[in-house]
Amino acid sequence: MLKGKTYLDHGGTTLYARSLVEKFSEDLVSNLYGNPHSASTPSTLAGDRVDEVRIRTLQFFNADPDHFDLIFASNATAAIKLVAESFRDYHESSESNKRQKGFWYGYHRDAHTSLIGIREFTHGSHFCFRDDEQVNRWFNSGGVIFRLYHARQIGLFAFPGQSNMTGRRLPLTWPAKLRSKKGAKIYTLLDAATLATTCSIDLRDKGAPDFTCVSFYKIFGFPNIGALIVRKEAGHMLQQRKYFGGGTVDIIIALDDTWHAKKDSSLHDELEDGTLPFHSIFALGHALDVHQQLFKSMSRISAHTAYLAKRLFRGISTLTHSNGLSVCRIYKDPEAIYGDPKTQGATIAFNVFDSVGTPIPFTEVEKLANINGIYIRAGGLCNPGGVANFLEFDASEMRAAFAAGHRCSRPLVVMQGRATGVVRVSLGAMSTLSDVNTFLTFLENNY
């Protein structure tokens, strides 16, 4: 499948192993599975398999099933939306919150678009932290700084474990620091979708986030599902959600009354609406097996990809034109160090410039790479805070760009002499030194 091709978009999705597809196919042709909501033998078998994979997946993230639950979702965005809707409904159902229009929400500048979207449920009670220092100042002030939230207001603080744009890894100590604040009613949501691709997510620590979202296709390539991992101590924040779907209620009256009783045996029984994508969940079980067989551990993947990313970073950063000007400008946080998995993931964001310093459209770099059998990603990457920060666009300029016709799917690639997006190269577990060298040769030969 990859002969003569170089895949460098593992941040979008990593590649699935052939053995995973074969094992999954063999499973489906060898067993009869029914809808888990039915009581037949095939359905019972399917339900048991779902339960088994749920526990194994929690263990993959070092999450004790006694203290965590896992709710399957269509992707990480759906998991994030579940938290957002639940906080909105919890706030509306609480008598103590009647005076506040919405729950308070804080999010980091590096947040993916899906995290930023939560702010629309807050009635304006939200705040975007510009950098880590601002987050830490907030912690140290007990939340008073910036007058961020009312003392009685429920809050949610969300951040990505790794920027999907630059690959910079954010501090995972924040949930513990926030939880240590006396009287704090602010919960934490970790977007681990990008981080989990090449880094072990260890939820054994008491400072684990209240909510963690993941995407399995980013880790294993297949299946295309995600999950929300919930600390059971924070689970009550999701239990006031108003919507209920099939399989989440014990009884419901449709005529003459509007009463219903939700399932309360487990958090996932209450929140997984309708029939689960059980075949995809079976595939996840095989993905866990194959991943371990091929790569042994996430720590090995982390070390491998960190080494490759460091080689790639050095290669890109040293490319120059004949007049000495750099070919590429890499967008990197000063505290992030390539080769150090604690601070930097295996992702590089950059733009290419000609010999007089004019940016070459990132779309053209992507197209030329594609023609050469090299698959990367370019654009805004659903990371508006990162784009605004590194490409130095303020809010008024972003609005002006939109008025001029700029769209995420149809970008104006250069505005006022500045690129409006970036080229991103992201490595994965099966990336090789040959992949790195192929891309560097591509840049050398064409720019």
Name each model feature, range by range.
Residues M1-Y447:
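Pyridoxal 5′-phosphate
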